């Protein structure tokens, strides 16, 4: 496995740059680095294939369209969608969720009906529903969390009513790494009028996705969290649901016929892709799917479990560290605080050691409120990370704690763990 990771790491040029040879990158829940195959696919498109799609009858235009639609086919296969017409390209997960809130919500949600989310959601799966609820005079409800930060499914049962029209939940938390039981939740909705949207931004790069098996109506994710380019994402939608949706934006390509007074619409997915799309980035996303398939998600998941287990073991040796984590190594995101030290101070000092990780509320302020803190530090892993990365992170963390606590009489050594939950 170590040889495999080293071979994979070689394909990521950022780690071999003169400026970043000592980089320890542990902010993968935010965005992943890009392999040569993805970068080369984008460059090759602009060098050899660049033309608009779905318009030109000339050879270059046909090749561009083939590359664009070929990426759609790859993505449909990657998530086991029924066919590629259920794949809509967006700017990312955020736009995909906003698309559903507008194109589905404005047409299907009525005054007094209900939207159900949870307290662990990223703001991108909260704010669009707030805006929709305000527009439609609907009711927004949230599933609370248990003491171990999981969805309170008993409370969910009581929150589901005959007025619930959409349930929107993360597949995996970007703060705790918890993977929600989406398939079980979808079964709860089978005899209701509610549709299910899944935010798959965190799970897409390491958990095999079968949208039919999950039982979801919508599945949204971003390219940049799965080793692909920024500025491109995907919304999967079931065909019968797509047919209930009005266009999200107006413009070229999404129309069938246009007069001065009215227009008719193209078929999905093009109905929801107005204007010139982000063609090169879509091609790059197709290359990212190929990259993941070549390695195998089972191998990636196994590696991430090993890294998470090692990190948890090392961090649990230390006092002063409080983990917001269940201890399950399949949850490959670890949020934590250090007693008496603000997460921002940790990040600033550890940056001097070229340790890159995230601090803040992680676009999940309701979850921070549940924790009783304003911010946490967070490390998250990708296929190119190694145990050496974690060792360097731990050593830098120890050194930083000693420096920041050195001015006081508090003990700076990180010894056996025994502290209460800390509120910053």
Regions from the PLM with identified roles:
Residues 1-424:
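Pyridoxal 5′-phosphate
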């Amino acid at each position: 496995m170590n040889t495999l990771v080293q071979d994979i790491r070689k394909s990521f040029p950022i780690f071999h740059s003169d400026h970043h040879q000592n980089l320890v990158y542990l902010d993968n829940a935010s965005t992943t680095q890009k392999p040569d195959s993805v970068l080369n696919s984008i460059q090759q498109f602009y060098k050899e294939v660049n033309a608009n799609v779905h318009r030109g009858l000339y050879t270059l235009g046909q090749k561009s369209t083939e590359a664009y639609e070929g990426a759609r086919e790859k993505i449909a296969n990657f998530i086991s969608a029924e066919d590629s017409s259920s794949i809509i390209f967006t700017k990312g997960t955020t736009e995909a969720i906003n698309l559903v809130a507008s194109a589905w919500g404005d047409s299907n949600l009525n005054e007094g009906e209900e939207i159900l989310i949870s307290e662990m959601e990223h703001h991108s799966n909260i704010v669009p529903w707030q805006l929709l609820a305000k527009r439609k005079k609907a009711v927004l409800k949230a599933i609370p969390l248990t003491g171990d930060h999981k969805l309170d499914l008993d409370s969910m049962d009581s929150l589901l009513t005959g007025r619930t029209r959409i349930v929107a939940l993360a597949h995996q938390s970007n703060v705790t790494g918890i993977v929600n039981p989406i398939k079980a939740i979808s079964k709860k909705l089978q005899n209701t009028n509610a549709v299910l949207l899944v935010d798959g931004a965190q799970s897409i790069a390491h958990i095999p996705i079968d949208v039919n098996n999950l039982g979801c109506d919508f599945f949204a994710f971003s390219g940049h969290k799965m080793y692909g380019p920024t500025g491109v994402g995907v919304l999967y939608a079931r065909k019968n649901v797509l047919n209930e949706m009005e266009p999200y934006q107006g413009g070229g390509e999404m129309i069938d016929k246009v007069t001065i007074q009215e227009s008719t619409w193209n078929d999905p997915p093009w109905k929801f892709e107005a204007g010139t799309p982000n063609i090169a980035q879509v091609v790059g996303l197709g290359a990212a799917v190929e990259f993941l398939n070549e390695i195998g998600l089972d191998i990636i998941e196994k590696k991430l479990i090993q890294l998470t287990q090692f990190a948890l073991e090392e961090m649990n040796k230390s006092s002063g560290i409080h983990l917001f984590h269940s201890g399950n190594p399949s949850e490959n995101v670890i949020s934590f605080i250090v007693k008496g030290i603000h997460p921002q101070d940790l990040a600033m000092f550890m940056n001097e050691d070229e340790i890159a990780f995230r601090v803040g509320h992680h676009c999940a302020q309701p979850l921070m409120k549940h924790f009783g803190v304003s911010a946490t530090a967070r490390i998250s892993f990708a296929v190119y990370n190694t145990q050496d990365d974690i060792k360097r992170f731990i050593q830098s963390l120890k050194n930083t704690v000693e420096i920041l606590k050195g001015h006081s009489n508090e003990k700076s050594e990180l010894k056996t763990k025994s502290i209460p939950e800390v509120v910053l």
